[in-house]
């Protein structure tokens, strides 16, 4: 029986994901149920590097970065499920597929993105996930994602 874990802060996330600033896009894990689901957040600030050029007079978080953040949350779920608290040094989880991506609202400075990712299945090292991002309870983005665990 799976159990819902406590919060994982940025230090714990950095033990799992190889990403670093400016490409680490998950700030905190609120809930994680190994093998099933994760709920995490990204606090979007005006200081984000991508807002310099997207767009100066009307800053909007690029949709591809919302998708990347969802993939990072899926990666944390996969790592926590299969590797434990720390990613194994000889393995990485690669983002390998996306289907049914839809963007429903703009994400702007001051928003808090809430990621909800469900692990649908894992077969031969490839995981399939249903992912959604919300702002203030309103759906901002949804997609079906795949990631693959590979030895390096």
UniProtKB/Swiss-Prot annotation:
What gene does the UniProt entry assign to this protein? fabZ
Functional note: Involved in unsaturated fatty acids biosynthesis. Catalyzes the dehydration of short chain beta-hydroxyacyl-ACPs and long chain saturated and unsaturated beta-hydroxyacyl-ACPs.
Has UniProt tagged this entry with the keyword Cell inner membrane?
no
Q: Where in the cell is it found?
A: Cytoplasm
Family the entry assigns: Belongs to the thioester dehydratase family. FabZ subfamily.
| The UniProt record lists the keyword Phosphoprotein | no
Query: What protein name applies here?
Result: 3-hydroxyacyl-[acyl-carrier-protein] dehydratase FabZ
Naturally occurring in which organism (per UniProt): Laribacter hongkongensis (strain HLHK9)
List the Gene Ontology MF annotations in alphabetical order: (3R)-hydroxyacyl-[acyl-carrier-protein] dehydratase activity
Protein EC: 4.2.1.59
Catalytic positions are 54
Q: Which UniProt keywords apply?
A: Cytoplasm, Lipid A biosynthesis, Lipid biosynthesis, Lipid metabolism, Lyase
